[in-house]
Amino acid sequence: MIITGQQLVALSPLLILMSIAIVVMLFIAYNRNRYIVFLLTSFGFLSVFISLFIVKKIVPIHATTLFHIDKYSLLYIGIVIISSFLACIFSHYCSLTNYLYNFEEFYLLLLFCTIGCVSIIISNNLCTFFIGSELISLSSIGLISYTFFEKKALEASIKYMVLSGIMSTLLLFGIALIYSVSGSLEFSSIIYELTMITKSFHNAIILFFGVSLFIIACSFKLSLFPFHIWTPDVYQGMSSEALMIFSTSVKIAIFSVLFKIFIVLSYFHIEEVFYYLVSIISCLSMIFGNIMAINQTSIKRLMGYSSISQLGYLFIVLVISRNMQFSLEVTGIYLINYALSNIGMFGIMSVLSSLYKNFNVDSIFSYRSLFWSSPILSGVMTVVMLSLSGIPMTVGFLGKFYLMSLVVKEHMWLFICLFIISTIIGFCAYLKIISCLFVAPSDSYCHKNIIISSQNINNKFLIGLLTTISIFVLFLGIFPQITIHLVKYFWIQW
């Protein structure tokens, strides 16, 4: 197999990440230096982000039979890299300062997880997808159990390891069934063969079970109902910095592949076979996730259930992906909001956990009256929560508005009713956190449990970074044409 120069350039984001991972491993082996490893990792992420502007000049392009890079892929690689870069920054200045040893391995796990995400996004082969998903799973287990001195972290890592192993088996079995009837592992070749296969009832049944197992395994990775059982426990056991990449990059990567597959399926009207399966998963996820989030007193568990509902909203796009241009636009806008909001929320928790050792960052009650002692962090937290709930003047409203418009075009009235009901329920869950922030301080509670003084917040850089994220959330919501033009730029030549 001959690889051309253009193909190497197209694969440069993946090659840069792999090279940086090798260099970091060598530094860890010969000379442990947390600061140098942090700089190398940050340099790698920045280099990948810059390389995207070079790659966009030659896309779309097939880089061997394993990878296909287009503008759609570049958009989500950019989101993944930004999420990983911010997780790297917050981990350096926040959580890793509390660890006694093994600082450097966190960055290595972060790199491996990002490599898995990028390889999945540009994958054009079921083998590439499987290897990438396994790389994500293995590095995620390390990220979950990195705070091994905490009981919840070990419990969460064991749960995720066992369930992830089971789902990997189902995924591999589904891939085997698809290969048995299509004779190919390439996405493009499989879709071509499907047009002939569906005429045979026997092959169609095998194909249906194979694709169904594939969707179920991906639903587990996306923590959708009813494959969500691990989500709240794993979220509660992970550090805030690890959650930045686990809750954004991993899910964006998995969803991007599913979306590309269903877009191609829609050309042959094969996606109608899986209409009911995807619709049921979507509706149950958005209702269940929001209902369970209401009674949570743990913010991480609440964000876990929130992720179930947020991805549940977006999952319905898979069955109406035949309206390709609008579906791509909706997906891009919605995932940009999802990434910004989650990074902002876990960033706040990361800053507070590092600045105040006695601060229970996971309890909602710990944030009681936070506004009166730290108005900036409270403001950022409020903006993030409002964006997740889809309130106007935030980018979250833009995402849900476009999603609703897409559903209305398809006349899916039942989904519209469930969408509105679940959004109202979700807003009540987010409002509980917001109301805690602005409660008037009381001597009997506030001063005994948490005393936050503005002079203690000495790391202005992280506070400024969080403020910038919240400004972006508002700016993109007030001026939606910027977000729309950005997303259109990536799908216009998809």
UniProtKB/Swiss-Prot annotation:
InterPro entries: NADH-Q_OxRdtase_suN/2, ND/Mrp_TM. GO terms for molecular function: NADH dehydrogenase (ubiquinone) activity; NADH:ubiquinone reductase (non-electrogenic) activity; quinone binding. It is found in: Cell membrane. Keywords: Cell membrane, Membrane, NAD, Quinone, Translocase, Transmembrane, Transmembrane helix, Transport, Ubiquinone. GO terms for biological process: ATP synthesis coupled electron transport. It is an enzyme of class 7 (translocase). GO terms for cellular component: plasma membrane. It catalyses: a quinone + NADH + 5 H(+)(in) = a quinol + NAD(+) + 4 H(+)(out). Its main location: membrane. The chain crosses the membrane at residues 8-28, 35-55, 74-94, 103-123, 129-149, 161-181, 205-225, 239-259, 273-295, 301-321, 332-352, 379-399, 414-434, 462-482. Its EC number is 7.1.1.-. It is a multi-pass membrane protein. Belongs to the complex I subunit 2 family. NDH-1 shuttles electrons from NADH, via FMN and iron-sulfur (Fe-S) centers, to quinones in the respiratory chain. The immediate electron acceptor for the enzyme in this species is believed to be ubiquinone. Couples the redox reaction to proton translocation (for every two electrons transferred, four hydrogen ions are translocated across the cytoplasmic membrane), and thus conserves the redox energy in a proton gradient. PANTHER family: NADH DEHYDROGENASE. NDH-1 is composed of 13 different subunits. Subunits NuoA, H, J, K, L, M, N constitute the membrane sector of the complex. This is NADH-quinone oxidoreductase subunit N. The gene is nuoN.
